[in-house]
């Protein structure tokens, strides 16, 4: 769920938040968790405290409100909403020159499907995903982040005009 007032995205799900902690802990603005998963996030809480980040233990119902889903698995991290950069010819040319692969998507409307594609791309070492600038295309959402199970930390997402 996006908090448009603060330009934030809720990242929920154990695997997604753990990969975020491992690869980009600096992205986490606030962390909320239930008592049963609290011991698994002690290290992250120390990092957040050191950098004046906020962490808080909350009941599961509060986490549902934060992320808009019952599928939070006891943890929600608030991050700045990721920007999707437009793809330019120079970038695509660089990929070709370096032998990098990309996944090109066309109107994957379901956020869960988009997240599963991101997860698969990350697993296979594909670092670039290109989506159309189209209202029917799913984007980076709380749901897609959760379903990607940490894959969002390994890919860059670009957009092209339809």
Can you say where each PLM-predicted feature lies in the sequence?
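RNA substrate-binding interface of SAM-dependent RNA methyltransferases
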Residues: 15, 26, 33, 94-162
